[in-house]
Each structure stands twice: as C-alpha cells, then as structure tokens.
C-alpha cells in the first residue's frame, strides 16, 4: 500500500498484509545539535510554484490561467506509468505508479480539480504540498517526490509505504507489550517534535495517518497525511474546528488553540495503544465532545490495573486539559517510560487487541444503516428537518450542493467556517457523489432528535436481512452496500471484520445493535459541527 496524504483518503490497507510481527518501530529522534534554535521558525517565503519539485525536462511553455499550483501544465504520464488503484477518497484516487526513467515505484494521488469547489479547497491542496515539501527529508515523515498539474487533475507523487497500517500490524502479531507501545509512540511524537520545531502544527494526528515504510519487522513508521496541517504564525490563535472526534483536544472545541493540540492527540493514541479503546467515548460525537471537555481519564477498568505507573504518568501528562501545563514533544521523548527503559516487555492482555480491532476504522455499515433509518422515519419524527432541507436546496433539485449548504447555513445564522462546512458536506455525503440528498441530510442530523430507538434499529437490520434469517450474510451486505455505491471488496471485508464479534462470518441482531450504539459515525478526520 502507498504512503499518500489526503484529508479525504480512504484507508489504504483494506485487505492488506496481516502476517507481519510487531517490534518497537524504528525511529529517529532529532539530535540536539541538529534542532533549529527557535521552536517556530518562519515558513518558507518562496512562491508555491518554486517550492513544488518537478522534472526540469519537457516543460509546457505556456502557463494556463486555470492553474491551481501556479506553474505550467504537465502530463504526468511522460514521467510515470500509473498502475493499480490503492485507495479512493472524496477528491480523487491514489494509484501505484512507476517512474519511467528509473523503474522506481511510488504512490500517486490524483485529485480531480472539478471537486475542488471553493477557493479554500484549492488553497488547502497548495498548502498540503508546500508543507510536505518543507518537511521532506525528515525521519518518520513520508517523502514527496513531486507535484504535477494538468487540465483535469493535480497529481502528487510520493513514497510508497508497503507495510500497511499501524493497527493492522499490531493486530496481526497477536501479542503486544508496553515496550512495543513505547516504540510506536516514540515515532509518533518524533513527528510532532519535528513539525513543531519546523513551525508546523499537524492538527489531525490519529493512527490511520501512520503507515509502515515496508513489510520488514523493523520498518519505519511514517506520517502520511498533512491535509489539515498549517504553518505556525507567531501569536496567532487558531479557531477552526478540525481533527477527528476521538482525538480532538478540548481547546479545539473552545475554538482557541495552538500547537499543543498535537500532544493531546498523541496522548489519545497512547491510551488506545495501551487499552484498545479511546479515553473519551460516547454514543455520538456530541457526547464524545462533552467527555473531552470533562477530561476524566479512566485508569480503573481493565487492563489499566496491570499497566505500569510510568505509562499512566505519561498518559496523564499528555492529556492534561490545560495546554499551558501539557507536556511538550521534547519532554515526552525524555520521559522515563519512553527513554529510560521503564516500559515492561510483558504481554498486555489479549482483550486489548480485540478492542483495538473493533475500533480501528470507521464503520461504514453504521453510516449506511443511519441512512436506511432516515428513509423509514415518519414526517412527525423528523419535523422541521424537511423544511430546513427545502430552504437550503434553493434550486429545488432534490440535492444540496456545497455552495447551497454554505449559503443556507449562513442564512440560518450559522457561523461555521468554510473548512467546517466542507467537513459537514463530506460527513453527510454517504455515496461520495459531491451532493447531499434528502435522506443523507436527515441521517446526518437526526441524532440530535435521539432517533435511536429499538424499532428504528430493527427496521434497519431487516432492510439488510433480506431473507429474514436473523443474520446479515456477506451476500446481503454486498448487495446493500453496492446499492449505495460502497460495495467494493475491501469495504465489505472491513465491515464484516469490525462488526462480526463472534467470527461466524455474518452479523446477527445483537452485533448490529452493538455497532449502532458504539461511538462516532463520522468519517475519520472530520467533525460534524451540525448539532
């Protein structure tokens, strides 16, 4: 699978390698003599087109006025041959590609320009490339090879990471220790330290954004997604709500934050690495946010009584509510549990791996089930939502576009930023066609009306259980997911593995209910700010 970066990417390692042992992951800590003297150096001042590397040969002589990257159009196929698809997201597709001149293999993320609707979308893509170029050459960060643009797409060519996702490797091993977790968190916090010393705040740290560089036991862990990252500006307070619900810091929800949010997110990852579940858990994203604001950490439930005090001390320091008192990246790397060998090598309870497996990815079936429930609700149950949809759908097409959503929410008194409106659009758009239909709109908003009663869940289960056998079979799941444009092999395999807790190859009603009552339903990397 490839190292590729996108705010809208689908997990790469669907159906990937699952037989690789876990060792403490190779990492490089920035030596003291190589660290910049100031923690927040100025970002590069070169124009974006001077920062993006492309071959000097065969340039197109005329710069097109429609260019996004600010440089001449080039045909990527002059330099690379595109191979199999690695992943598909909201904005485009990632392929394996081979450099024609050398035969070297890379990952190529092709972003469709017609899906970059707003000026902000285009600026986000430029900034992502700029930051990846700026961080290029640093350990534990994916290398970007070059960026190309033609009339239809922007193509990012980057390092191919064949080792797959972090959690997949941990789960595949079947046994796990604090020492292994310490090696992993060292790599993750090393990325944070590099970013902060080079004047970048990541803003979306989560396990899915880290891949292994190869299938080797000692493969390096690489950060792959900088789509929400920004340059740190002296004295600036950030107010956009960004990130993923489970990993978001309390100050983000208060709309006043800085680089300290990355340490909080890394602390959440550490908690999951040690227990298999996130520290702040609820049945919907509002509940998760409430728990984050409270900041009460459970060290009583299993396996915490058997986890070392040193590990718990580090978790507490990383999940300190006050960002001014929160531990820094450099301090994490100096902590005795990380540096002093205090992390024991004894196996952690195997139940942690089971919980981690259930948690590891977004549950597509749950999102689909919410849409099915929305389609079966009565007018009384959804009350004003139909009117709200009609008011936003100004051209009466039956679907809401990004521009309609932005305009409509502003008219309704919303103060969401462009980034947040875009996140809402992506979260609600189940079939990924770039618009929200009526039932997608209802399913994205109905949680506020507590429409999670048993009869609705049972109706949704019956929708999938076509033969009324009391189980959702693989074929029934495939049929339902294809109906909504989600029926690729990897997605079906992912859903079965997440929901089928008794491992009989099908989903019974109890498993379905447990899934529906679990945590957030929103896509990884996005918050749904529509409460």
Curated annotation (Swiss-Prot):
Residues 380-415, 416-451, 452-487, 488-522 form the EF-hand domain. A lipid is attached at residue 2 (N-myristoyl glycine). Residues 48-60 have a biased composition (Polar residues). Signal peptide: none annotated. Ca(2+) 1 binds at residues 393, 395, 397, 399, 404. Residues 1-62 are annotated as: Disordered. It comes from the Eukaryota. PROSITE patterns: EF_HAND_1, EF_HAND_2, PROTEIN_KINASE_ATP, PROTEIN_KINASE_DOM, PROTEIN_KINASE_ST. SUPFAM superfamilies: EF-hand (SSF47473), Protein kinase-like (PK-like) (SSF56112). Residues 1-10 have a biased composition (Basic residues). Coiled coil: none annotated. GO terms for molecular function: ATP binding; calcium ion binding; protein kinase activity; protein phosphatase binding; protein serine kinase activity; protein serine/threonine kinase activity. GO terms for cellular component: cytosol; plasma membrane; plasmodesma. Its EC number is 2.7.11.1. The keyword Calcium applies. It is found in: Cell membrane. Residues 343-373 are annotated as: Autoinhibitory domain. May play a role in signal transduction pathways that involve calcium as a second messenger. Mediates the phosphorylation and activation of the S-type anion efflux channel SLAC1. Belongs to the protein kinase superfamily. Ser/Thr protein kinase family. CDPK subfamily. Interacts with SLAC1 and ABI1. This is Calcium-dependent protein kinase 21. It comes from Arabidopsis thaliana. The lineage of its organism: Eukaryota, Viridiplantae, Streptophyta, Embryophyta, Tracheophyta.
């Amino acid at each position: 699978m490839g190292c590729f970066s996108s705010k809208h990417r689908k997990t790469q390692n669907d159906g990937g390698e699952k037989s690789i042992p876990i060792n403490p992951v190779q990492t490089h800590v920035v030596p003291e003599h190589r660290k910049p003297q100031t923690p927040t150096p100025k970002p590069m001042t070169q124009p974006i087109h001077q920062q993006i590397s492309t071959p000097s040969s065969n340039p197109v002589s005329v710069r097109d006025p429609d260019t996004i990257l600010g440089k001449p159009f080039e045909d990527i196929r002059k330099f690379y041959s595109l191979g199999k698809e690695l992943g598909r997201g909201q904005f485009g597709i990632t392929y394996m590609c081979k450099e024609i001149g050398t035969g070297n293999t890379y990952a190529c993320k092709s972003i469709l320009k017609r899906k970059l609707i707003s000026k902000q979308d285009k600026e986000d893509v430029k900034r992502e490339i700029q930051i990846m170029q700026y961080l290029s050459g640093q350990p534990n960060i994916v290398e970007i090879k070059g960026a190309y643009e033609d009339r239809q797409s922007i193509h990012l060519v980057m390092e191919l990471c064949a080792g797959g996702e972090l959690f997949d490797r941990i789960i595949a091993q079947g046994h796990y220790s604090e020492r292994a977790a310490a090696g992993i968190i060292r790599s993750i916090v090393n990325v944070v330290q590099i970013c902060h010393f080079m004047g970048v705040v990541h803003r979306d740290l989560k396990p899915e954004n880290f891949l292994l560089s190869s299938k080797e036991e000692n493969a390096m862990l690489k950060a792959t997604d900088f789509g929400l990252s920004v340059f740190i500006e002296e004295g600036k307070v950030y107010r956009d709500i960004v990130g993923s619900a489970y990993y978001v810091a309390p100050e983000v929800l208060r709309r006043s934050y800085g680089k300290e949010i990355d340490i909080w997110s890394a602390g959440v990852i550490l908690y999951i690495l040690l227990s298999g579940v996130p520290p702040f858990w609820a049945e919907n994203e509002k509940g998760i946010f409430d728990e984050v604001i409270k900041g009460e950490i459970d060290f009583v439930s299993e396996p915490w009584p058997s986890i070392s005090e040193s590990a718990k001390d580090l978790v507490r320091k990383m999940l300190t509510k006050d960002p001014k008192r929160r531990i820094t990246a450099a301090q994490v790397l100096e902590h005795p549990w990380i540096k002093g060998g205090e992390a024991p090598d004894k196996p952690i309870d195997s139940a942690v791996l089971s919980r981690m497996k259930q948690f590891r990815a977004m549950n597509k079936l749950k999102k689909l089930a919410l849409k099915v429930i929305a389609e079966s609700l009565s007018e009384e149950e959804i009350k004003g939502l139909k009117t709200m949809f009609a008011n936003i759908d100004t051209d009466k097409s039956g679907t809401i576009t990004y521009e309609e959503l932005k305009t409509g929410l502003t008219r309704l008194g919303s103060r969401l930023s462009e980034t947040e409106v875009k996140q809402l659009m992506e979260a609600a758009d189940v079939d990924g066609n770039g618009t929200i239909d009526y039932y997608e709109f209802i399913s994205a908003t109905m949680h506020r009306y507590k429409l999670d009663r048993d009869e609705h869940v049972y109706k949704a289960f019956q929708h999938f259980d076509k033969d009324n056998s009391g189980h959702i079979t693989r074929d029934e799941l495939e049929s339902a997911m294809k109906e909504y444009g989600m029926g690729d092999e990897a997605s079906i395999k992912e859903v079965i593995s997440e929901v089928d807790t008794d491992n009989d190859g099908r989903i019974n009603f109890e498993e379905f209910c447990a899934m529906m009552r679990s945590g957030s339903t929103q896509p990884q990397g996005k918050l749904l700010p529509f409460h």
